[in-house]
Each structure stands twice: as C-alpha cells, then as structure tokens.
Amino acid sequence: MAFHQFAPSSSLPIWSRVNNPFTPKTSIITSISKPKSKPKSNLKSRSKLRSRSRSSTCYPIQCIVIDNPSSTIINNSDRRSANYGPPIWSFDFVQSLPIQYKGESYTSRLNKLEKDVKRMLIGVENSLAQLELIDTIQRLGISYRFENEIISILKEKFTNNNNNPNPNYDLYATALQFRLLRQYGFEVPQEIFNNFKNHKTGEFKANISNDIMGALGLYEASFYGKKGESILDEARIFTTKCLKKYKLMSSSNNNNMTLISLLVNHALEMPLQWRITRSEAKWFIEEIYERKQDMNPTLLEFAKLDFNMVQSTYQEELKLLSRWWKDSKLGEKLPFVRDRLVECFLWQVGVRFEPQFSYFRIMDTKLYVLLTIIDDMHDIYGTLEELQLFTNALQRWDLKELDKLPDYMKSAFYFTYNFTNELAFDVLQEHGFVHIEYFKKLMVELCKHHLQEAKWFYSGYKPTLQEYVENGWLSVGGQVILMHAYFAFTNPVTKEALECLKDGHPNIVRHASIILRLADDLGTLSDEMKRGDVPKSIQCYMHDTGASEDEAREHIKYLISESWKEMNNEDGNINSFFSNEFVQVCQNLGRASQFIYQYGDGHASQNNLSKERVLGLIITPIPM
C-alpha cells in the first residue's frame, strides 16, 4: 500500500467564515523486554471476558511498587465544583441485570435465521429490490453479518455499469445505489445526479419536490459528499428545502404520522451517515419496519434476536467493568470527578458495537474514564499550579515528581501509569511491539492542551475561534482514543502510521476530533457556563463576529458538516496507510459524539432522555 504525507488541513479559513485497570496497588512498568517471537493472539476479536488474569507465558517486566507515597500539601484554595450527582446506575443495579438472551437455544435459532436471510439476500433477482434489501438489512443493524455478500453484490453492480450507477434508474433508485456504493468505498461520480437537473438553469428539477422518496434518497446521499463536490452540496440544500416543506404540510394535516413522514422527520433531525448503528437499528425496528405492510417476519425476528443477544454481551461487559470500577475505589479517591461508568460504556456502543469486540469496548471504557478524570481535574478541580506540576510529572514520566503532587493527583497519575502499562502489555502480546512512548507522548500533549485552556480561564483570555479549535481538538482526547483504536484494529502496525499518529495529526484523526470537540460544545455550553469555564467555540464565534448564539450554533454545525466531508475523503482512499477498519472507527467516533451530545450533555447529565437511551441500548431488550 502506498504511503503519503498528511499536510495540514487547508480548511482553516472556515473557522471565521460567517456563512454557514487501575488497581489500588501502584505497580508501575518501567521497561518491557520484547519477546523473541510474536505471541499468537487476536487483540481485536478477543471476546472472552477476562478478569485480567494472564497466561502462563511471561515476559520480563521491571516494576516498581509504591506503598503510601509521601504527600506534599499544596495550598488548598477555594476550588470550583460542578456538583455532579451520584450515578443513577448503581453497582447493585448493574450486577443484578438478568442476562436473558444467552445460551444454545438462542444461538441455534440465530444461526438458522442468519442462513435464511443470507439465502434471501443472494436470491433476489430484481436489481432494485436487492438494493432495497441491503438498505433494510443495514438499517436493521445486521449488515455486519453479511459484509462479504453485500460487497460482492455491490461490486458486481458497479462493474456491470462501467463503474457507474445504473443510468436507467429514477432518482430514488439512483440515490440509493449511489449512497450504498459510496458507503462501501466505491468511487462513484457525483455527476450521475446531473440527469436530474434542468439543463438550462443548472438547478435540480422543481418536480423532485413531488417525489418525496426520491428527494429523501438524494438528501441522504448528499451526506456522503466530499470536499469540493458542489453537485452534492447543491443537492443537500435543495432537498432540505423540499423535505422541510413536506414536513410542514404533513404536520398541518393533524393525522397520525405516516411512515414516510417519520422517515423525513428522522432524516432532517440527523442524516443516516451521522447516526450510530445501534440507535438507528432500534428506532427502525420499532418505529418503521414492524409497521410496514411488506415486512418480512424472518428478517424482523432475526434483527430483534440479534439486537437482544448483542445487548446481553454488553451487559456482561458492563458487569465486569462495574466490578473493576468498584475495586479501584477511584470514585472515592476522586469525588470531584463525574462518576459515569455506564455513560463511558455507552460511547463504545457507538464506536464498535459488534459482539466480537468485547475487549476493545472494555479497555476503551477504561480509557474514557481516564479522560474524564483528566478533563474534570483540569476544568473543575485543579489549581493552575497543580495542573502545571501534573503535566511536568507526566512529561518526565518520573516517580520522583509524585512527591510534588497533592494526593488526588497521585491517584490520577497512578491510574494513568497503570492503564498505559496494561495497554502496553496487551499490545506487546498482540504485535510484539512496545507502544508506551507513543501513548505517553499523546497523553502529555493532551494535558498540555488542557493546561492551555486552564491558563486562558485563569487569565480571562478570550481565544479566537481558530485558536480555540486548534487547541480544543487536541484537548478533547480524540487522538488518544484513536491511537488505542489503531492498535486494536490494525495488524500489522506500521512505523509510518504510528509516527503519523504521534506527530503528524492525520486528517482523519483531526476531523474526527474536531467533530467530537464541536459536538461537545453544542451539547454542554449552557451547563459549563453556569459553573464557569473557558469560552467555547460558540462564544468564540460570537466574540469574533458579533453573531447571535443561534447564528453561532448554526456556524458550528456547518463546521461539523465540513469535517464530515473531510472524513468522507478517506473512504476507499488507496493511498492511505490506514485500514478501512480504522477509518470506520474514526468515523464512528464522530457519530458517537453527535449521538451523546445530540440533546445536551449526554455524558454528564442524567436526565430522562439520557436514561432512556441507556435503557434502550444496554438494559431493556426489544420485545420479541
């Protein structure tokens, strides 16, 4: 695979554009000897839940155990408090969850249904009907079980039409095929939609507004557009107007919502490309597919059973994590930190939902806990002097620095050490590679950018939007999350990719992190301003331009849309040394961000909507 250099993003001018397993014992690894031969294991598909026991194979590890380190007391000035409430998902509640959909009888039934659906998918003779079935399977959340078959079908359709969608299709069929092909990395030209433009005016034909399914399909397809694809930009603007007009007319009828109306409202709220698979699957099963007259009972039963069985896997993982969290006593040692283990796990349902990735979800949840601790320490509790000391200690990776830290920071520092070393041990087993230096550098960079925001806050400095975003996409932790994901979903790892992740800030990581940062700002602004914080992107834009808050929010949404175009550029990019699987994780981080912060601060706040989302995706099965 060819390599290429990632240049700094050329989209910076848009910032100012007015338009649119920690254990209580602190065992710290200081060196790891590389094994002579690579152990045979599979990090990304390790689905057996572990209690952190290790195999009998041992590698030389030098450790330092510190009991009751000395503490230097730093003046305890009045500290800010976010007054985070206790978690609504208690340890006893999580441990009491019944694992309903486990066992041979469910597995046997699922396997039979899977074979039936596979025959159904392959046996469809009508080309459009086959595309519609693929779309339905995707929206039901079960396409991951038929990836090879779907790719084979789409590849055949692509090559049979000289690498273009079928020219004889109407708008609905053309948009559907375009979206599915783009989704799987096929280079489909946007010019196919010129067939639906008025050749005299160059605008989309007005009668498209009468074809709601066609307009809806074109709207969804437009969100697979890449930077500079003006036809798809025009399509999005045009179809948004069409769909909003239809929504207004439908709402005035005061009748029960039709399925088309539900689909239109759902799409206008957030397009398919930006939605997480599990949430979309639950909504589509319960609100759309069950109510369709042509619903296939086999397909519906399979989708429900798969959803519930995967949910049972999540419940097992969450039980393990809740025991880890309780045993760590971090909630007691760091009472100022958001105690949101279940919410940290909910992120993982958006990032990689498939049942075989249990290990990744467990470790990534612990990473989110670590990032939450560091975030709250910088944003809420730590003094500027303490935060500088913490960054220095992390940068030097020197235990002697701990004597300068207050006790609460020692706990945070030990957790960072232990978690980094646990990850390093697993990466060593999987890849025969010691990655501590890479992960450590990103953790130091993360804290430096957090420290910058703390300096802004204490000095009263108001950054420009460009200053804020250039610092904020690095302080939000996306690059740390995705470094972990790279090792989990890449084999073999390459030196070039690692150096790029560590130093080069690749475009896909940058823009996934920008979406994370900006979605966070949209959802948390009001709460963070109440407790006092550095100005967020919305306020920075208002200060830069004199815009109202509503105008600023629209501009931030526009920036998110522009970052999605940049990420779309990576789909099927043969010049990238990042795998399609890693690109998908980057995109899923963007999706999970928009899901968590869609209606407010879904990470910290525990309102009814946040509770319903946890219940729907992790706790309560879909009725069979």
From Swiss-Prot:
The keyword Cell membrane does not apply. Keywords: Chloroplast, Lyase, Magnesium, Metal-binding, Plastid, Transit peptide. It is found in: Plastid, Chloroplast. Residues 35-53 have a biased composition (Basic residues). Binds 3 Mg(2+) or Mn(2+) ions per subunit. Mg(2+) 1 binds at D375, D379. One of its GO terms (molecular function) is terpene synthase activity. GO terms for biological process: diterpenoid biosynthetic process. CDD domains: Terpene_cyclase_plant_C1 (cd00684). The keyword Acyltransferase does not apply. A motif (DDXXD motif) lies at residues 375-379. Involved in monoterpene (C10) olefins biosynthesis, constituants of cannabinoids and terpenoids-rich resins. Catalyzes mainly the conversion of (2E)-geranyl diphosphate to (-)-limonene, and also produces minor products such as (+)-alpha-pinene and sabinene. This is (-)-limonene synthase TPS1FN, chloroplastic. It comes from Cannabis sativa.
